[in-house]
């Protein structure tokens, strides 16, 4: 059974979308293996977004991600990584199809180019393992 890391970002938590997102996960037939509401630290965010540190939008991204609590968790199921990414929709809300989480709930980039796109999901088994270990290290991060 494949596992992946997911996150409901500060805008999703603030707008009361936790129940909607979790309901979509469960209706899809995936299992919620872990859930935790956390206030992210700068250190966790720097590690999580390490590949984006040189981007011009990075400071705004970190400010956004530290603007409130996030819900983090692990979901499992057959081909859950690819399926969850499809359920989320394209990163940019303007490109996300209706019926996806981002298509239905995310907000277009503001005048500073900052997106509030509600959710995150690992993009590969390696990323899932790394992100589960980073955020929920007390759990097993094995992806069989």
Swiss-Prot record:
Which top-level enzyme class is recorded in the Swiss-Prot or TrEMBL entry? transferase
Q: Which reaction is the catalytic activity of this chain?
A: a 2'-deoxyribonucleoside 5'-diphosphate + ATP = a 2'-deoxyribonucleoside 5'-triphosphate + ADP; a ribonucleoside 5'-diphosphate + ATP = a ribonucleoside 5'-triphosphate + ADP
Any Gene Ontology CC annotation: cytoplasm
EC code: 2.7.4.6
Q: Do you know which SUPFAM superfamilies this protein is assigned to?
A: Nucleoside diphosphate kinase, NDK
Q: Which cysteines are joined by disulfide bonds?
A: none
- Residues binding ATP are 9, 57, 85, 91, 102, 112
Recorded GO molecular functions are: ATP binding; metal ion binding; nucleoside diphosphate kinase activity
What's in the keyword line of the UniProt record? ATP-binding, Cytoplasm, Kinase, Magnesium, Metal-binding, Nucleotide metabolism, Nucleotide-binding, Phosphoprotein, Transferase
Q: Does the keyword Ligase apply?
A: no
* Record-level GO BP terms: CTP biosynthetic process; GTP biosynthetic process; UTP biosynthetic process
Where is it located?
A: Cytoplasm
Q: What does this protein do?
A: Major role in the synthesis of nucleoside triphosphates other than ATP. The ATP gamma phosphate is transferred to the NDP beta phosphate via a ping-pong mechanism, using a phosphorylated active-site intermediate.
Q: Which family does it belong to?
A: Belongs to the NDK family.
- Tell me the protein's name: Nucleoside diphosphate kinase
Q: What organism is listed for this UniProt entry?
A: Streptococcus uberis (strain ATCC BAA-854 / 0140J)
């Amino acid at each position: 059974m494949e596992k992946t890391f997911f996150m409901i970002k500060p805008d999703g938590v603030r707008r009361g979308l936790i129940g909607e997102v979790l309901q979509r996960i469960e209706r899809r037939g995936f299992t919620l293996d872990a859930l935790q509401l956390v206030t992210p630290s700068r250190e966790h965010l720097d590690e999580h977004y390490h590949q984006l540190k040189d981007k011009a939008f990075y400071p705004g991204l970190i400010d956004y991600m530290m603007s409130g609590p996030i819900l983090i968790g692990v979901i499992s199921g057959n081909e859950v990584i690819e399926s969850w990414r499809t359920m989320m929709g394209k990163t940019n809300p303007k490109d996300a199809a209706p019926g996806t989480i981002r298509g239905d709930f995310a907000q277009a980039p503001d005048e500073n180019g900052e997106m509030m796109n509600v959710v995150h999901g690992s993009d590969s088994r390696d990323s899932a393992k790394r992100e589960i270990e980073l955020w929920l290290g007390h759990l097993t991060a094995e992806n069989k």
